[in-house]
């Protein structure tokens, strides 16, 4: 009786993921168009009218709703809704709290993470375990997922590289026109011998869950200290003055310095006071 919806284009792997729900006998629902056309909660209106039981969106969409003060539960009936899935980028602790406070308090929130190349999830939700804000609950079935340090040792409660130590059902077996599998091996097995290196910067928490900090190739390394871009975005996005932001690492004086670009909301100027507030918040929380 499940009715599954994930907002996606046909070009994203979540389209394939959504079609896969048919194999379990579920009904799938599609939405074509801009998800905030004329109203911020358009997708929730769709979910309510179509009696969706699993509702899937991106973490960025949740952040946008939160920043705009949208409270979907005030206008829509979510009596059929059992699960909300989030992917595309790390869902912040604030995002978790927003969902439970403003959408539905007794829903199962499943933050999931995998990849287009595997059309699957390495880590995802689990109905038999508690949900902790900011964490992905557990490994996927058949996925021997771990976190390695730079030397290839397994680590807990420390940031490192997300890996899968054994073959798994949905891994690609080769690249097209890749003589000798050189590109394939370079993409996944060059960093750790015979271990799939996925390129996510993450950690395993004391609860046994996972926190994803962003892609390893976007990880900043000022002064030799690794810092995920998601850690900075989660701080900056809380400022009412900031509409959009992007952070990069720039080579500088034999090191890396962090450069933050921001777009302010209407009515605000980039004053010294705003700069200092943002810098202080990043220093304390990231």
Please place each PLM-identified region on the residue numbering:
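Short, well-ordered beta-strand segments
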Residues: 3-5, 162-163, 261
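Hydrophobic alpha-helical scaffolding
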Residues: 7-8, 33-37, 50-55, 85-89, ...
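Adenylate-forming
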Residues: 9, 32-35, 52-98, 110-117, ...
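AMP-binding/adenylate-forming catalytic core of the ANL superfamily
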Residues: 48, 55, 168, 194, ...
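Conserved AMP-binding/adenylation subdomain of ANL enzymes
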Residues: 1-3, 10-53, 68
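Residues embedded in well-ordered beta-strands within globular domains across many folds
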Residues: 5, 56, 82-85, 146, ...
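Conserved AMP-binding/adenylate-forming
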Residues: 48, 82-209, 216-219
């Amino acid at each position: 009786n499940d009715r599954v919806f994930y907002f996606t284009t046909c070009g994203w792997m979540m389209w394939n993921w959504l079609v896969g729900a048919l194999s379990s006998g579920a009904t799938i629902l599609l939405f074509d168009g801009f998800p905030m056309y004329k109203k911020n909660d358009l997708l929730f209106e769709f979910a309510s009218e179509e009696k969706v039981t699993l509702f899937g969106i991106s973490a960025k969409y949740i952040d946008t709703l939160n920043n705009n003060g949208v409270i979907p539960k005030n206008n829509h009936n979510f009596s059929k809704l059992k699960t909300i899935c989030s992917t595309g980028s790390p869902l912040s602790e604030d995002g978790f709290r927003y969902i439970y406070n403003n959408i539905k308090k007794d829903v199962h929130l499943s933050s999931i993470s995998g990849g287009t190349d595997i059309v699957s999830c390495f880590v995802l939700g689990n109905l038999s375990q508690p949900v902790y804000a900011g964490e992905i609950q557990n490994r996927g079935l058949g996925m021997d997922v771990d976190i390695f340090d730079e030397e290839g040792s397994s680590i807990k409660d420390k940031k490192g590289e997300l890996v899968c130590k054994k073959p798994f059902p949905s891994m690609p077996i080769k690249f097209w026109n890749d003589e000798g599998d050189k590109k394939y091996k370079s993409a996944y097995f060059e960093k750790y011998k015979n271990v799939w290196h996925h390129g996510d910067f993450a950690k395993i928490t004391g609860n046994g869950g996972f926190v994803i900090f962003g892609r390893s190739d976007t990880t900043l390394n000022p002064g030799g200290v690794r810092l995920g871009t998601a850690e900075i975005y989660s701080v900056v996005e809380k400022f009412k003055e900031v509409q959009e932001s992007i952070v990069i690492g720039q080579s500088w004086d034999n090191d890396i310095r962090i450069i933050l670009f921001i777009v302010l909301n209407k009515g605000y100027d980039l004053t010294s006071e705003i700069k200092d507030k943002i810098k202080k918040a990043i220093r304390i929380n990231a």
